[in-house]
Amino acid sequence: NTLRSRMINDLDFKSLDFVNKKGLKSNVNFHVKYLISSYKNYDEYRSNLNSKLMGIIELQTSYPLVKTSKKFINYLDPKISLRVNPSKMANSSNEERTINNNNIFNINRLGLIDTLESGNNLTLGIEFKKEELDDNSKYLELKLGTVLRAEDNNNIPSNSAINQKRSNIFGNIVNNLNDNINLDYEFSVNSDLDKVDYHSLGAEFSKNEFKTRFNFIEENGVVGNTNIIENKTSYNFDKNNSLIFETRQNRELDLAEYYNLIYEYKNDCLIAGIKYNKTYYSDRDLQPAEEL
């Protein structure tokens, strides 16, 4: 029999922003993890009580700029983050972790339970946003980010694409300027700019009580091996009653993964619904199933 027990304490500290006379904004952040673990009959761990203290120190600097015109307000925000962690990192190369522009500047961006990203690295990024003055829900947004490190770190999850000296370049574009059509595109390109490891294209159309959204997702190389198209369509009969249809097509296997048809009733106190689900396969087992 094997036995594993762990006690983990995490401490985060973020300083107040310091803004100089030229508008340069800086802050210092710490993330400390204290791990106490005990293992029995694990080949890769010593069978006794272990403790380890790890920490990341980060200096983050940005230079936010704003420009206003008659109809729009434009934001430009270049960022740089210097991180240092001298402690040793546990081998997490086989863990599944996704890095994108929503988490690349998080100090614990890998979200690993019992270890922290080690070594020295620079995270570079830039954000641009064009927003309507009269309606801030209508905007065009572009984000780019990448990671540079002193040396390769093979303990970092390989599918995160940030374990090499020059990581992938991560980006996303969102266009919400139209009343009825919203578009978003997310991508991850290798450092040589000759291979797209991940891209996702989303399109949403809404008119009155009708809304439909299509997503195309493709993963290649170190990120994964996925090629799917999915759709979610909904219609609100009134403020309480709606009908929802969902489906996903796996283009890699040339199979439909599922169809969902959902009737939903919703008020201030209650959400109730009836769901018909037809699944064509689950994971590696090609076992069709129907559920109501």
Walk through the language-model features, giving the residues of each.
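Outer-membrane beta-barrel translocator/pore domains, especially the C-terminal barrels
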Residues: N1-L292
